[in-house]
A protein has these predicted regions:
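Secretory-pathway glycoprotein ectodomains that are cysteine- and/or Ser/Thr/Pro-rich
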Residues: 1-279
Length: 279
């Protein structure tokens, strides 16, 4: 972080400001990644060690986003984000077939919604809606990529060991107390862009769920049914990709040794982004 860049951050009113001479991570657009700056004078070796967790989290998020296939997925699914106070839709995402079956905005007569939400003030309580328009049950996984790049599981949380699929025609909300999700999703933390990824599959994500069960058990009963931060995000995402690969191989697609593949007939991944702003 140079003195010139520090002055630029001051003009942009970025908080907290990093120390001049500190090591930090930046996006391709030269934007500071929140929470990545260290202390002034830190060695490159120490900086790399300190940032290993965040680098893994950013890599995991990137790998998941590479699976986004709303335009090519053959499943009919729709997802949306709404405020709890007033139930206002602020963003939605859907597959091509999901749009034909009726998106949330179409059903409510709302126009102009995209997968990019309006600016959401800190402290706003929101929830996410997912509609299964298929004739078969679907398994739903919802991940949050926070402003600082941390990867967090919003659903399933397996508070009661439940990983039941969403039945045909069913709409669920997240968080949902009936699914063991005992939390309220309030937009908090640092300002910036956050993203929610909704992954739907026709087969259960066995390996990923097993890892979530281990993480949930380690946290104890007091945190049961609350979002799970992935302390080893690369391991979690590789488990997820393995599940998607196994589901694809079981669908009769031609497989290549050593190459993970995803069958768009078996899964769909959608993205909803929103900007966290100050109150």
């Amino acid at each position: 972080v140079t003195s010139v860049y520090y002055q630029q951050l001051q003009k942009l009113k970025v908080t907290p400001l990093p120390e001049i001479g500190s090591l930090a991570l930046f996006s391709l657009a030269a934007d500071l990644i929140p929470g990545s700056a260290g202390i002034s004078g830190e060695s490159v070796t120490d900086g790399v060690k300190r940032l290993q967790g965040k680098l893994k989290s950013l890599l995991a998020a990137r790998l998941v986003k590479l699976t986004l296939n709303a335009t090519s997925a053959r499943l009919s699914v729709a997802a949306a984000m709404e405020t709890v106070d007033g139930g206002q839709l602020v963003a939605e995402s859907f597959t091509v077939r999901g749009a034909k079956s009726g998106s949330f905005s179409q059903n409510r007569g709302v126009r102009g919604l995209t997968s990019n939400a309006q600016k959401i003030k800190q402290g706003t309580q929101v929830q996410f809606l997912v509609q299964n328009n298929e004739l078969v049950p679907l398994y739903i996984t919802v991940l949050l990529i926070s402003v600082d790049g941390t990867l967090c599981v919003l659903s399933p949380l397996l508070g009661r060991g439940d990983n039941s699929p969403v039945t045909p025609g069913e709409k669920i909300q997240i968080p949902d107390p009936n699914r063991g999700e005992r939390y309220k999703f309030k937009v908090e933390g640092e300002t910036g862009i956050a993203e929610v990824l909704v992954i739907t599959t026709t087969t259960p994500l066995t390996k990923a769920v097993e890892l979530l069960q281990v993480l949930a058990a380690e946290r104890g009963d007091s945190l049961r049914g609350t979002p799970v931060d992935l302390t080893q995000p690369d391991e979690a995402i590789f488990s997820l990709l393995d599940d998607l690969d196994e589901g694809s191989r079981g669908s009769g697609t031609n497989s290549l040794p050593g190459v993970r593949q995803i069958d768009t007939r078996q899964m769909a991944a959608m993205s909803i982004t929103f900007e966290v702003v100050g109150m």
